[in-house]
Amino acid sequence: MTFAEWAAFYDKKNPEDPFSPTPGYDLYFVPEKGFCEVRFTETMAIIGQLTGDGRFFRDKVEEVARKLGYKEGGTICIRKEIRAYIRLFGYCIEREEKLPDGEIRYHARHKKTGKWLRASPMFRYKGSGELAYGVTWEI
């Protein structure tokens, strides 16, 4: 697919927040895989807007991050079902932490590597009320 086709696909899946390049992020496009924004802060590799093969882009970002000495990754998950997202990336939920506002933070561990992941409620979209999660993980 072309970049325009991938962007249209992103917009269809996320109509409340259509694609627009994020300042400070580098954009990577692979026609058969999709696109991904990435930013390296002082301490973390952050994946921004992404559409297509999330595992492919996560693996590529982690590969670069390891070479640069990064230990943590982060992203915002806008999927409707955070538990499915956690499983998709190979993690098993170890603990659900109920927060004061009634939302749940998920603590998970990767099934093969044993590395941790944490998914915390971040914000709700005004139109749909869908909850987005801030996700951090051990690289």
Question: Where do the model's predicted regions map?
Answer:
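Acyl-donor binding region in acyl/amide transferases
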Residues: T41-G90, E97-G102
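Alpha-helix C-terminal capping segments
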Residues: M1, Y10, F19-T22, Y28-P31, ...
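Short beta-strand element of the conserved SAM-dependent methyltransferase core
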Residues: V30, V38, H107-K111, Y133-W137
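Conserved catalytic-core motifs of GNAT/GCN5-like acyltransferases
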Residues: C92-K111, W116-A132
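Short, solvent-exposed secondary-structure boundary motifs
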Residues: P15-E32, L88, A108-K111
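Conserved donor-binding loop and adjoining core beta-sheet/short helix segment
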Residues: P21-R55, Y125, I139
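Short amphipathic alpha-helix that is part of the acyltransferase structural core
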Residues: M1-D17, T43, E138
